[in-house]
């Protein structure tokens, strides 16, 4: 399974831009209005806090906020920070592109050239499909299985992954070793179920997708009848792939998705595919140690390699390249607009394309994120915030230590192992100690298409080069400006990039109640991931190992079944319910995160005065809830219900708090209130 990245960031939490570019230097909070940790003006006093706390804390904002037309969702905290960061990063990239290079920055010339290539819409229009046709010509060399292997390797090398994915990963049984991973993939729709379900909504999306595919092929130069014929062949191939893939819930099982094999085993599983040719053309002929996430998918690949004619493979490879480059907005506007219309209507609900400059900030950050991130961190990240965050982390780890020492349902052997794991957790805050080397990344200022392929190729090669080499424990999986955080179970580490360590999550000089309610819960959330239904399966060294005695493991499962049942009962959108099994890990982390942060706050604080008219205890919970105020279009809610391991924001607030006696006490909520679950139904894991 690819290295687990358990994230807080909403997949589409984007927002309207602020006009004007900020000056370089200073605090990002000085560049744009910041969102306060607690804002009474956005609350709805007509709602009782004990009935629906999310509506109480966010209701005024939800009633008045208008989603910008280019946004599928807007989160009051994540999106507000993201928007400020986009402005700051834009200013850095523009200055580099203009040739005003700061010698203290890393690779400003490459940052500037990549940004300029992305922003050159006239140049992209003028080049037309020239680069695409050159890549298609290489795909047209696919005439048999050896040439198909070369064609797949060429595309995989360029970060386009038809048929399957290949990556590096830590060996789940020996986390010190880096091996290769062959994983299910190759689909164009967001999830396998979009191909397999036969309800009216799914059939509508399937029909719309085939029409979209045909229109894209026509834009790429095919006659309409030939485009329609290729569409049906491509769709049939993708649907066959989808039918052998595991669901997102099945893919959450680290035991099931760990299947170690060597090159001979890979060749035995898929004998028709010339793996030696593929690996040689990939540039990694020496790879010999692998895991695969989905053995049945390898069986399906074997069938497809044996039975699918070369002309279908050529059509499919061309489509996957075309779709990838259109998603990067590296093709003329007609491709971008066609793709937007399909995805917005069926999956996001956005009414307009995101402004080009915002896309280019994200693309530049994706290609050269640690170069841009070094400049960002040097100018805008305050070290005092880093030290305060470390203190909060320490306090929350102490709360977890106390919890593990006292929890009644855990026996001593399991408790010792849990405490040992907690003591070995590594915390990374702000930015890495060593910055990524981009010497080998090739950027072509005159061609955004080639720059995207160059950046993709650099990253694929960097990733695969790790196989067989010593584990780099200093590597970060997120760039510093990212408004996010994660726990990695195989490295047993928590990472808090600089991007999230600003208002409203962390506010210098704010009362502890506010900071613990916001960034403190983020910390508690990530810490709990180390002991959720997935994280608990890894030991202190990051190895997949059952260190729980059977009776304690059974009790853990009983407690998590309560969480599944609770969230299964929540409405997501229309007639769709939250998937309690898909969201289980995040729901456990939400439950544990708020409880641990509240315990740490109570242990750390001296007497605090009321905050914005609330007691300190109440202020903690208001800050927590207001961090999740989110407006989301129904199209995106439907997509998230099918694919996102996070619950909708309302339930990320009301779900945990309705299980928490400390919340009920803070607001004097009586038994029977909407925010007080019956004692027999109350869920508690950590």
Identify the function of each model-found stretch.
Residues 21-31:
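Short, low-complexity, disordered segments immediately C-terminal to signal peptides
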């Amino acid at each position: 399974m690819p290295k687990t990245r358990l994230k807080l960031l909403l997949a589409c939490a984007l927002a309207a831009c602020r006009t004007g570019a900020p000056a370089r230097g200073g605090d990002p909070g000085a560049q744009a209005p910041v969102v306060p940790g607690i804002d009474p003006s956005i609350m709805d006093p007509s709602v009782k806090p004990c009935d629906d706390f999310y509506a109480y804390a966010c209701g005024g904002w939800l009633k008045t906020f208008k989603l910008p037309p280019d946004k599928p969702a807007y989160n009051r905290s994540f999106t507000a920070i993201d928007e400020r960061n986009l402005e700051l990063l834009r200013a850095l990239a523009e200055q580099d592109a203009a040739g005003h290079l700061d010698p203290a920055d890393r690779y400003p010339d490459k940052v500037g050239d990549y940004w300029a290539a992305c922003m050159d819409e006239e140049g992209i229009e003028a080049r037309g499909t020239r680069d695409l046709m050159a890549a298609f010509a290489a795909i047209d060399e696919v005439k048999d299985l050896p040439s198909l292997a070369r064609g797949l390797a060429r595309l995989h090398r360029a970060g386009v992954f038809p048929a399957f994915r290949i990556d590096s990963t830590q060996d789940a049984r020996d986390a010190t070793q880096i091996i290769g991973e062959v994983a299910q993939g190759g689909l164009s729709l967001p999830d396998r179920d979009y191909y397999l379900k036969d309800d009216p909504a799914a059939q509508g999306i399937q029909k719309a997708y085939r029409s979209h595919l045909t229109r894209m092929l026509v834009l790429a130069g095919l006659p309409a009848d030939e485009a329609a014929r290729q569409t049906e062949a491509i769709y049939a191939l993708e649907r066959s792939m989808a039918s052998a893939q595991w669901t997102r819930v099945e893919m959450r099982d680290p035991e099931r998705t760990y299947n170690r094999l060597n090159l001979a085993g890979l060749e035995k599983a898929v004998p028709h595919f010339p793996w030696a040719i593929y690996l040689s053309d990939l540039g990694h002929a020496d790879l010999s140690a692998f895991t695969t996430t989905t053995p049945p998918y390898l069986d399906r690949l074997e069938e497809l390699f044996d039975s699918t004619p070369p002309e279908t493979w050529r059509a499919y490879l061309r489509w996957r390249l075309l779709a990838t480059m259109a998603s990067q907005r590296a093709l003329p506007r007609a491709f971008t607009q066609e793709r937007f219309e399909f995805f917005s209507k069926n999956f996001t609900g956005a009414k307009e394309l995101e402004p080009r400059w915002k896309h280019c900030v994200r693309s530049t950050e994706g290609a050269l994120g640690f170069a841009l991130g070094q400049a960002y961190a040097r100018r805008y990240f305050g070290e005092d915030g880093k030290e305060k965050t470390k203190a909060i982390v320490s306090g929350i780890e102490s709360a977890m230590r106390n919890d593990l020492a006292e929890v009644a349902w855990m026996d001593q052997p399991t408790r010792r192992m849990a405490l040992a794991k907690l003591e070995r957790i590594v915390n990374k805050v702000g930015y890495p100690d060593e910055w990524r080397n981009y010497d080998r990344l090739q950027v072509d200022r005159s061609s955004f298409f080639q720059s995207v392929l160059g950046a993709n190729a650099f990253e694929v090669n960097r990733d695969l080069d790790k196989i067989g080499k010593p584990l780099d424990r200093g590597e970060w999986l997120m760039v510093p400006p990212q408004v996010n955080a994660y726990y990695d179970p195989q490295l047993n580490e928590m990472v808090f990039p600089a991007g999230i360590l600003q208002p409203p999550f962390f506010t210098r000089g704010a009362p502890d109640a506010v900071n613990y309610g916001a960034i403190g819960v983020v910390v508690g959330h990530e810490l709990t991931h180390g002991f959720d239904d997935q994280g608990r399966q890894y030991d202190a060294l990051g190895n997949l190992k059952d260190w729980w005695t059977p009776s304690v493991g059974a009790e853990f499962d009983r407690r998590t079944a309560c969480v599944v049942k609770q969230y299964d009962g929540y409405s997501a959108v229309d007639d769709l319910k939250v998937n309690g099994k898909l969201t289980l890990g995040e729901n456990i982390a939400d439950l544990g995160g708020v409880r641990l942060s509240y315990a740490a706050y109570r242990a750390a604080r001296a007497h605090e005065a009321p905050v914005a008219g609330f007691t300190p205890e109440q202020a903690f919970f208001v800050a927590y809830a207001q961090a999740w105020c989110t407006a989301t279009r129904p199209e995106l809610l439907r997509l998230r219900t099918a694919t996102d391991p996070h619950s909708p924001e309302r339930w990320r607030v009301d779900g945990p708090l309705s299980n928490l006696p400390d919340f009920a006490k803070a607001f004097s909520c009586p038994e029977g209130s909407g925010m007080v679950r019956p004692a027999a139904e109350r869920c508690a894991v950590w």
